[in-house]
C-alpha cells in the first residue's frame, strides 16, 4: 500500500511514523447516513448480534436501532432542529447508549452529563450548549427541572416493532453532522465545550491496524460520558460491530475488584488511563491476559507497569496513545513491545487514519529532525472548534492562513505540546510549551511554583522540575532546586512550611538545596542536568545505604518499597519517618498498599500509610502478621477518618450543675483565641465587665511574657486599648491547643479546671490554602483537649465558636434550599468535602462537640456568618478574605459574578454581644445558633449588592465579569503585594471538575435562625440583626485607608 498520501512531513524520507487507512469489514460503505447509518447497517446485516450487555441482559443491534428510532421520534415531535444540543443524564447501563443513539438518529447533538456533577455545573454545560431538552433515566428524573425532560423508557418492544423499524433507514446526516459535545478538564476557568463531528469517529473506527476490534469483542464502558474516551467505548465499539459492556465507575476505588470484574465480564477491549494502569497491573498482573487490545494514555506512559503486563499476562495489542479532546480521542499511537519497556523508551510511531502532523517553531516554521517544536494536528479527527469561544477557537484551530507552513486544504489544531521527531520519524512528547506539566493527575505550572518559592524571600534562585525515575511505578514528583539566601541557617522545612501557607498541597515540592545552578548553551538553567544529577545522586545514596544493611530484614525491604513509590525522596528514609512527612500522596499510599500486600501478604489501610505509621512501626506491624486495624475513613477524604473521634476521648461529664459564670463568686474566665479578630473583641468586652474577676488567655508562645505581648499587640492593632478596659484582670499563659494538657502541664491544667467558671473557645487555625491535616491539630485535637479541660475539675459551661462553613456548599452539592440550626450535622458530611481544610476541621470539631452535648456536657455552639467590622467604629480585619477581595477588586476595577452567593455578614460587636448575652441564659444550654440575619433579611445576592456599594464608596466605575475572566485578570497583576495573591490557590484550585471552592458556594441555602430569633427576641440591641449597608461599608473602608 502506498502510504505517501498519509504521511505528513515525511514524504521525502523513510520513517517509522505511519498512517493507516482501513480495510473495510463489510465492503464499501455509504457515509451519507452518518453514524446512525452505521448502526442501521449492523442491525440489518446481523440483527441478533449483541450491541450492549449489562447486568445479565442484552440489547441486540436490531433492538438498539428500534429503541433509538422510537426515542428519536419523541424528540422530533418536540420540534428539535438540526444539531440541536440534547442533554443526556443517566447512570451506568443501557439508557446512556440508547439515548445517544436516539439523539444521533434525530439529527441532534449529544451533550452527555455526569450525574455526580453539582447542579450548577450541569446547568452551565446545558445552558452553554443551548440545550432545552434532556433525556434522563428514572434516577435522575427530578434533577433538571429547569429543562424539558424526557424519560428514557426501556420497556419491552415487540418483534413487529423491530421489523417495522428495520424497514425505515434513519435520517441522512452525513459526516459533517455535529454528533457530540465533549468537555475538557482544563486547569483554569470553566470547561471548554468541544464539538465532535461524525467524520472524526468514522475516521478513527476505520483504522483497522490501530483499532483491531471485531464482532466478537467486548468493550468495557466506564469513562465519564462527558470525556472523549467514552466516545471510543461507545461509538467506536458500535461502528466496529462489537459489544459494549457498561461497568460502574464506583469500582475505581477497589482496583483488585475492578480487575476481577473485567475478567468476569469477559472484557476484551479496555481504555485505561495511564495513572490507573499501574494500580490495576500491580493488583493483578495477569489482568489483561486474553484481551484483544488495551489502550492507555492521558499522561506519559508507565513503562514498568506495561512491562509487567507484557511479561505476565499480555493482551494481543497494548497501545500507548496520545491525542487531545480537540482531535477526538487518539491522533498518534504506538504499539508497545517488551523491547520498548526494557529499553525504557516509548515513542509515538503511528498516525491514526488520515491524520497529519506538523512540528513548528515559535515563528511558525518547520523544525528540523532532532529539534523540538509545537505539535499541530490535522485531518478528519480535528474538531470544528469550541462552543461560544470564538477567540479561543481562532487561536487554536488554524489553517495555512495563520501559519503559511501548514499544508493547504486541511484544518489543524495547535496542541501547545512540545515534541521532537527523530531522523527515523519517531515522535517524543516533552510536555507543555507553557511549562505546564501533569503530576499525579494535577496540572502544575512550574513557573507558578517558582514564583511562589521566590515570594517566600528564602531563596535567590530556583528551578521547579518534574522528576521521574526510570524505576518509578507511580509517575512523577515535583522537585524544586534552590539556592538559599542564607545557606548557613536555611533548612528545606523552612521553605516547605512557608509554601504550605501559600499554595495547594500538591504544589508544595520536594526541596533540593544547590550551591549553584548549571547553565546550558543558551545561558539558561539546565533543567535536564539538574534532574539527571538529582536522580544519579539519589540512586547512589540508596545503593550506599543498601550496602550497609541486611537487605533481607523487613524494615530494609519496606524502606526499598517506600523509596520506589516516593520518587521525590532522594535522602535516606529513617526509621522514624512517616509516609506523610516525606510528602506521600493518597495515590502513592494506595500503591504502597498494593506493594505491601504483594510483598508481605498483609492488609493495611490508607490512613495507616499516609498519616499514622512510621517506617519502624509499619515494619513491626508486618512482623506481627498484620494486626486487625480499622478506622472510619474514606480513602481520599482525610476528615472522615475523624468523624467518630469523640468516642476515643472516653469522656464523662462532671456531676452537678455548672455555675452562672457571672455569679457573685464566679467571674473567672478561661478563653482561647484572644489573638484572633473575634477573640480580641470578646476579651476587650469581658475586661470591661465588673462581674469578670479575671480572664486567663491560652496563647501559643514561648513563654508567658511573649504570650501577653501577643495579646496586647492585637488589642493595639484593633484600637481596643481604652480607659474602660481593665487589663490588670488579664493573665496570658503560654500553651498549645493540640497538647492534651493544653501545654500547661498536668498540675496547672487541673488547677485551672477547678478555677474556671466557664470556657470561651474561639481559638482556631485558619488558612484557606491548607488542607485538613494542617488544621487538624489546632482545630480538631485542640477542641478535643478543650473538652478534656471541661471534664476536669468542677462543672463549667463551654461556649464554642464554630462557623457556617460546617454546612459546606450544601446548596450546590445537596440541593438544600434551607438548613436549620438543629439539623443533624452528618447531613452535610458530603458537602463539606468540597470546602477547604479549615471548614472540614471545623465540621469534625463541631461533630465532636455535638456528641459531647448528647452526653450532657453543658455546651452552646455559635455559628457566625462572615465576621465583619465593628458596626460603630468600622474597625475590621484587613487580612481576612472579604477585606482582601474588596481591596483587590478596587484595584482591578472589576469584580466577579457570583450568582446567589451571600456572606451573611455579622458585625463583630453584635456577635460578641450575642454570645455574651446567650452565655448568661440557661435556655442556651445544648443549643446551636446560626448567628446570621434572620430568614427574611438574608439577601439572595449579597455579594453583588456588596460590590455595588463598594463601587459607590470608591466613586469609581466597577465592571462585573465572569469569574474565570476576573480570575485571569487578577493573575495578570504583576504585583506581589496584591492582597489576594496569597489566596490564589483557593480561588483557582479546582475542587470538583472546574469549580473552585469559592464558586462552590453559589446557590446558597437559607440558614435557619429559629433558636437565635427565639432567644434574642426581646433583647434590646440584639433583637434586630444589623445588615451590611452603605454607611457601615464606608466606615470599614475608611478604617483600612481604602477610601
Curated annotation (Swiss-Prot):
The modification O-(pantetheine 4'-phosphoryl)serine is found at residue 586. NRP synthetases are composed of discrete domains (adenylation (A), thiolation (T) or peptidyl carrier protein (PCP) and condensation (C) domains) which when grouped together are referred to as a single module. Each module is responsible for the recognition (via the A domain) and incorporation of a single amino acid into the growing peptide product. Thus, an NRP synthetase is generally composed of one or more modules and can terminate in a thioesterase domain (TE) that releases the newly synthesized peptide from the enzyme. Keywords: Alkaloid metabolism, Oxidoreductase, Phosphopantetheine, Phosphoprotein. Pfam families: AMP-binding, NAD_binding_4, PP-binding. One of its GO terms (molecular function) is oxidoreductase activity. It catalyses: L-valine + ATP + NADPH + H(+) = L-valinal + AMP + diphosphate + NADP(+); L-tryptophan + ATP + NADPH + H(+) = L-tryptophanal + AMP + diphosphate + NADP(+). Residues 672-915 form the Thioester reductase (TE) domain. Campesine G features good insecticidal activity against the global honeybee pest Galleria mellonella, which supports its future application in the development of biopesticides. The lineage of its organism: Eukaryota, Fungi, Dikarya, Ascomycota, Pezizomycotina. Its EC number is 1.2.1.-. Residues 549-626 form the Carrier domain. Its cofactor is pantetheine 4'-phosphate. Residues 671-914 are annotated as: Short-chain dehydrogenase/reductase (R) domain. Belongs to the NRP synthetase family. PROSITE patterns: AMP_BINDING, CARRIER. This is Non-canonical nonribosomal peptide synthetase cpsA. NCBIfam families: Thioester-redct (TIGR01746). GO terms for biological process: alkaloid metabolic process. Non-canonical nonribosomal peptide synthetase; part of the gene cluster that mediates the biosynthesis of campesine G, a dimeric indole piperazine alkaloid that shows good insecticidal activity Galleria mellonella. CpsA catalyzes the first steps of the pathway by producing L-tryptophanal and L-valinal from their respective amino-acids. These products condensate spontaneously to form trypyl-valyl pyrazine also known as didehydrocampesine A. The NmrA-like family domain-containing oxidoreductase cpsB is the next enzyme in cps pathway and reduces the unstable didehydrocampesine A to campesine A.
Amino acid at each position: 500500500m502506498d502510504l505517501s498520501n498519509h504521511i505528513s512531513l515525511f514524504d521525502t524520507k523513510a520513517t517509522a511514523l505511519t498512517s493507516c487507512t482501513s480495510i473495510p469489514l463489510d465492503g464499501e460503505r455509504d457515509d451519507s447516513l452518518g453514524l446512525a447509518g452505521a448502526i442501521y447497517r449492523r442491525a440489518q446485516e446481523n440483527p441478533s448480534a449483541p450491541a450492549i450487555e449489562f447486568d445479565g441482559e442484552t440489547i441486540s443491534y436490531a433492538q438498539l436501532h428500534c429503541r433509538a428510532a422510537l426515542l428519536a421520534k419523541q424528540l422530533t415531535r418536540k420540534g428539535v432542529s438540526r444539531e440541536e444540543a440534547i442533554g443526556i443524564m443517566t447512570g451506568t447501563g443501557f439508557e446512556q447508549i440508547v439515548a445517544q443513539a436516539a439523539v444521533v438518529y434525530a439529527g441532534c447533538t449529544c451533550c452527555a452529563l455526569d450525574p455526580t456533577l453539582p447542579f450548577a455545573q450541569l446547568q452551565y454545560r446545558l445552558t452553554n450548549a443551548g440545550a432545552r431538552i434532556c433525556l434522563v433515566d428514572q434516577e435522575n428524573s427530578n434533577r433538571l427541572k429547569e429543562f424539558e425532560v424526557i424519560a428514557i423508557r426501556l420497556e419491552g418492544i415487540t418483534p413487529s416493532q423491530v421489523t417495522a423499524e428495520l424497514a425505515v433507514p434513519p435520517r441522512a446526516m452525513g459526516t459533517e453532522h455535529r454528533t457530540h459535545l465533549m468537555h475538557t478538564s482544563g486547569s483554569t476557568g470553566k470547561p471548554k465545550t468541544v464539538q465532535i463531528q461524525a467524520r472524526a469517529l468514522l475516521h478513527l473506527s476505520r483504522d483497522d491496524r490501530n483499532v483491531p476490534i471485531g464482532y466478537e469483542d467486548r468493550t468495557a464502558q466506564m469513562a465519564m460520558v462527558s470525556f472523549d474516551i467514552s466516545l471510543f467505548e461507545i461509538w467506536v465499539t458500535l461502528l466496529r460491530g462489537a459489544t459494549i459492556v457498561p461497568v460502574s465507575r464506583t469500582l475505581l476505588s477497589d482496583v483488585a475488584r475492578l480487575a476481577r470484574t473485567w475478567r468476569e465480564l469477559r472484557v476484551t477491549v479496555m481504555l485505561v488511563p495511564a495513572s490507573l494502569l499501574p494500580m490495576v497491573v500491580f493488583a493483578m498482573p495477569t489482568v489483561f491476559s486474553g484481551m484483544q487490545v488495551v489502550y492507555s494514555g492521558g499522561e506519559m506512559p508507565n513503562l514498568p507497569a506495561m512491562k509487567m503486563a507484557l511479561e505476565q499476562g499480555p493482551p494481543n495489542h497494548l497501545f500507548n496513545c496520545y491525542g487531545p479532546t480537540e482531535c477526538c480521542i487518539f491522533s498518534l499511537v504506538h504499539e508497545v513491545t517488551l523491547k520498548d519497556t526494557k529499553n525504557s523508551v516509548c515513542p509515538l510511531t503511528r498516525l491514526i487514519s488520515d491524520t497529519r502532523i506538523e512540528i513548528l517553531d515559535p515563528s511558525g516554521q518547520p523544525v528540523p529532525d532532532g529539534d523540538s517544536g509545537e505539535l499541530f494536528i490535522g485531518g478528519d479527527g480535528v474538531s470544528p472548534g469550541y462552543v461560544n469561544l470564538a477567540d479561543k477557537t481562532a487561536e487554536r484551530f488554524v489553517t495555512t492562513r495563520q501559519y503559511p507552513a501548514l499544508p493547504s486544504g486541511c484544518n489543524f489544531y495547535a496542541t501547545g505540546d512540545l515534541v521532537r521527531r527523530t531522523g527515523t520519524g519517531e515522535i517524543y512528547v516533552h510536555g507543555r510549551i507553557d511549562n505546564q506539566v501533569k503530576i499525579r493527575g494535577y496540572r502544575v505550572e512550574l513557573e507558578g511554583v517558582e514564583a511562589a518559592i521566590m515570594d517566600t524571600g528564602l531563596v535567590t534562585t530556583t528551578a521547579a522540575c518534574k522528576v521521574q525515575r526510570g524505576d518509578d511505578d507511580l509517575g512523577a514528583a515535583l522537585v524544586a532546586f534552590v539556592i538559599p539566601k542564607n545557606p548557613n541557617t536555611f533548612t528545606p522545612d523552612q521553605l516547605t512550611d512557608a509554601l504550605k501557607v501559600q499554595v495547594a498541597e500538591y504544589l508544595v515540592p520536594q526541596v533540593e538545596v544547590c550551591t549553584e545552578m548549571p547553565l546550558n548553551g543558551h545561558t539558561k538553567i539546565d533543567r535536564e542536568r539538574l534532574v539527571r544529577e538529582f536522580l544519579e545522586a539519589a540512586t547512589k545514596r540508596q545503593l550506599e545505604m543498601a550496602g550497609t544493611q541486611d537487605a533481607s530484614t523487613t524494615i530494609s525491604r519496606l524502606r526499598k518499597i517506600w523509596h520506589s513509590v516516593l520518587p521525590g525522596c532522594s535522602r535516606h528514609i529513617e526509621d522514624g519517618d512517616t509516609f506523610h512527612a516525606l510528602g506521600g500522596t493518597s495515590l502513592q499510599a494506595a500503591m504502597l498498599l498494593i506493594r505491601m500486600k504483594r510483598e508481605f501478604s498483609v492488609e493495611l489501610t490508607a490512613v495507616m500509610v499516609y498519616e499514622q505509621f512510621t517506617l519502624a512501626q509499619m515494619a513491626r506491624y508486618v512482623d506481627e502478621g498484620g494486626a486487625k486495624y480499622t478506622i472510619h475513613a474514606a480513602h481520599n477524604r482525610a476528615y472522615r477518618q475523624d468523624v467518630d473521634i469523640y468516642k476515643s476521648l472516653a469522656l464523662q461529664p462532671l456531676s452537678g450543675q455548672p455555675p452562672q459564670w457571672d455569679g457573685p463568686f464566679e467571674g473567672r474566665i478561661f478563653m482561647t483565641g484572644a489573638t484572633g479578630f473575634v477573640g480580641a473583641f470578646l476579651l476587650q468586652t469581658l475586661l470591661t465587665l465588673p462581674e469578670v474577676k479575671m480572664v486567663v488567655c491560652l496563647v501559643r508562645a514561648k513563654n508567658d511574657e511573649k504570650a501577653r505581648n501577643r495579646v496586647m499587640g492585637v488589642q493595639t492593632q484593633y484600637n481596643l486599648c481604652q480607659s474602660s478596659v481593665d487589663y490588670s484582670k488579664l493573665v496570658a499563659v503560654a500553651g498549645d491547643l493540640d497538647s492534651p494538657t493544653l501545654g500547661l502541664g498536668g498540675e496547672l491544667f487541673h488547677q485551672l479546671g477547678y478555677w474556671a467558671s466557664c470556657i470561651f473557645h474561639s481559638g482556631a487555625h485558619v488558612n484557606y490554602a491548607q488542607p485538613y491535616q494542617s488544621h487538624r491539630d489546632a482545630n480538631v485535637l485542640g477542641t478535643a483537649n478543650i473538652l478534656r479541660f471541661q471534664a476536669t475539675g468542677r462543672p463549667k459551661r463551654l461556649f464554642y465558636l464554630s462557623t457556617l462553613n460546617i454546612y459546606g456548599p450544601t446548596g450546590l452539592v445537596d440541593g438544600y434550599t434551607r438548613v436549620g440550626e438543629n439539623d443533624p450535622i452528618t447531613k452535610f458530611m458530603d458537602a463539606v468535602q468540597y470546602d477547604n481544610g479549615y471548614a472540614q476541621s471545623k465540621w469534625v470539631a463541631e461533630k465532636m462537640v455535638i456528641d459531647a452535648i448528647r452526653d450532657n456536657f453543658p455546651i452552646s455552639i455559635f455559628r457566625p456568618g462572615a465576621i465583619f467590622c465593628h458596626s460603630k467604629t468600622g474597625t475590621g480585619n484587613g487580612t481576612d478574605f472579604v477585606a482582601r477581595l474588596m481591596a483587590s477588586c478596587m484595584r482591578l476595577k472589576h469584580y466577579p459574578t457570583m450568582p446567589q452567593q451571600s456572606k451573611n455578614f455579622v458585625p463583630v460587636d453584635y456577635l460578641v454581644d450575642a454570645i455574651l448575652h446567650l452565655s448568661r441564659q440557661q435556655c442556651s444550654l445544648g443549643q446551636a445558633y446560626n448567628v446570621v440575619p434572620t430568614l427574611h433579611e438574608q439577601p439572595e445576592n449579597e455579594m453583588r449588592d456588596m460590590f455595588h456599594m463598594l463601587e459607590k464608596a470608591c466613586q469609581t466605575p466597577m465592571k462585573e465579569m465572569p469569574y474565570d475572566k476576573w480570575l485571569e485578570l487578577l493573575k495578570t497583576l504583576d504585583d506581589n503585594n496584591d492582597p489576594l495573591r496569597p489566596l490564589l490557590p483557593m480561588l483557582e484550585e479546582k475542587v470538583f471538575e472546574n469549580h473552585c471552592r469559592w464558586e462552590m458556594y453559589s446557590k446558597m441555602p437559607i440558614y435557619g435562625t429559629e433558636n437565635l430569633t427565639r432567644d434574642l427576641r426581646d433583647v434590646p440591641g440584639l433583637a434586630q440583626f444589623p445588615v451590611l449597608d452603605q454607611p457601615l461599608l464606608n466606615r470599614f473602608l475608611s478604617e483600612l485607608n481604602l477610601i
